[in-house]
Amino acid sequence: EERREETDRANQYVRRAVEFIQRNYCNPIRVTDVADYVCVNRSYLYTLFQKSLGMSPQQFLAAYRLTKAAEMLMVPHLPVESIALSCGYQDPLVFSKAFRQMKGVSPTMYRKQIQQDENRVNREHLKQVEEFISRVGRLELGGEP
């Protein structure tokens, strides 16, 4: 019973820390800020993150920021520099390097790949619609489906 309470408390700390990061990822955050918010010391927070998520608080913050950046890169007109700043990176070059490490391509190339994939999907969808219309047209004319 006591062990379960300890686990529940640890999970609650991690949950609160994750929520804090999700709300504040666009600002400069130090692990100390997160630990202070959760009311635990920095090393204990690190241990909790390692046990619960398999990564450090810094790694979680970086992964969350880069995930948000990847979402924002889907919006074609947003400049990469603005996305970097919006995701808590003060230096666009640091952002680009971190993004490349996570995704294997630069933010600009990632955006191009997304657009190419969208175009491919749109072309495939258009082809399916045209085939469907053609089948429907043949049915209406009494031809073979």
Regions from the PLM with identified roles:
Residues 1-5, 9, 44-46:
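An amphipathic alpha-helical interaction segment
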Residues 6-10, 23, 38, 61:
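Residue-level marker of regulatory loop/turn positions in helix-turn-helix DNA-binding domains and
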Residues 44-45, 49, 94-95, 99:
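Short hydrophobic/aromatic patch on the recognition helix
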Residues 41-42, 90-91:
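Short coil turns linking two alpha-helices in DNA-binding domains
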Residues 7-14, 31:
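Short, structured helix-loop boundary elements
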Residues 18-19, 23, 28, 32, ...:
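Terminal helix-turn-helix DNA-binding modules in bacterial transcription factors
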